A protein has these predicted regions:
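A gly/proline- and charged-residue-enriched helix-loop-helix capping module
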Residues: 118-131
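N-terminal secretory/targeting leader peptides
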Residues: 2, 6-18, 25-120, 136-349
Length: 349
């Protein structure tokens, strides 16, 4: 039995909707959206639910989205992309990095010290990059949008101020490139989906995890570790990319007017809406953690950050050098990604 589900109906006040005349006999369609975080998570409450409500409102209630958090439709987080491809779910939200090496081009944003510290420039850059470079990479699904989060933070059971403090530390990483960056800094990276982090910490399988502030409360990380290390400024240590994707046959089967509604809530508009969650909720969570008596927020110095950047340079070189065998020019993609991030960061001021 499915324990919890969110059925999101039309009628959310204050949402602008395009003119859509509803015939008396108009078909109503419900799409199932599947993801891996609990319903209390910020992305569920502040992005997926409002987004689904907006779609319902603008379709005059004809297109409803039923959200299933915490893998309630079965499977494991790395299977979400294939669930959209195969029609197990109509829509999924996941990390391309959950299946290491399968989507190599989008990894360019996940390389160390490439991303901006804010989510909005990263999200806009990833979506624009998709238009030119990623359509073939995600051809098995209908991408609604792609984006990336803000600065990642190292949360651990010991104080981390210098590279030497990371030596041998077992840290959960979200993507292949984040893992390589941690290894370059001397840590012992361990890959796992974020819902597994609390149990792994409790059983001392890991000493900490790298995640953005936004996700911390949903996995009770502030209760399980006491030390939170930030990397100052931009570029930041790492980010993670995300995709909101739909089964292509399900999309193709929608009536034209409902496709129009979904398309209006896709692409850059959806990427910006998602990024706002990280940029707004991250500082709120950080402040909550700062007020906890036993928790300590640490920011490494600029000089120490420079050491980390130098140590991580081989990670970028290895990705570039391996790109030719995968059929693309890694150096060119890296230059393009950096240029797009810089453009959108400058536009925000």
């Amino acid at each position: 039995m499915i324990a919890r589900r969110s059925l999101l109906l039309a009628g959310a006040a204050g949402l602008a909707a395009p003119a859509l005349v509803r015939p008396a006999s108009a078909q109503e369609i419900t799409l199932r959206l599947h993801h891996f975080l609990p319903a209390v998570s910020a992305v569920h409450r502040h992005f997926l639910m409002p987004w689904a409500q907006k779609v319902a409102t603008e379709s005059q209630g004809r297109l409803r989205i039923q959200i299933f958090p915490s893998m309630q439709l079965g499977g494991a987080p790395p299977q979400l992309f294939d669930q959209a491809r195969d029609g197990v779910a109509d829509i999924i939200w996941t990390l391309p990095g959950n299946t290491p090496g399968r989507f190599p081009r989008i990894e360019v944003f996940e390389l160390p010290f490439v991303a901006d510290r804010r989510a909005a420039p990263n999200a806009k850059a990833v979506w624009e990059f998709y238009q030119t470079h990623l359509r073939d990479e995600f051809r098995e699904v209908h991408p609604i949008t792609v984006w990336a989060h803000d600065a990642g933070v190292i949360h651990a059971n010991k104080e981390i101020r210098r590279m030497e403090d990371l030596r041998g530390l077992k840290l959960r990483f979200p993507t292949r490139q984040a893992g390589e960056a941690l290894r370059a800094l001397g840590a012992a990276p361990i890959g796992m989906p974020v819902p597994q982090v609390p149990e792994a910490l409790s059983q001392r399988v890991i000493d900490g995890a790298v995640v953005p502030w936004e996700v911390v409360p949903s996995i009770r990380l502030q209760e399980l570790v006491r030390h939170h290390t930030e990397i100052p400024g931009s570029p930041t240590f790492y980010t993670t990319t995300f995709i909101l994707a739909m089964n292509p046959a399900r999309y193709a089967g929608l009536p034209a007017e409902l496709k129009q509604v979904l398309d209006a809530n896709s692409g850059m508009a959806a990427a910006e809406m998602a990024a706002k969650v990280w940029d707004e909720q991250g500082p709120v969570v950080r402040e909550q953690v700062a007020r906890r008596r036993d928790n300590r927020i640490i920011q490494i110095t600029e000089a120490e950050k420079e050491r980390w950047m130098i140590a991580c340079r081989p990670v970028l070189d290895a990705w570039i050098n391996g790109s030719a065998a995968r059929g693309f020019d890694g150096a060119a993609l890296l230059a393009d990604a950096r240029g797009l991030i810089a453009k959108h960061a400058a536009a925000r001021g």
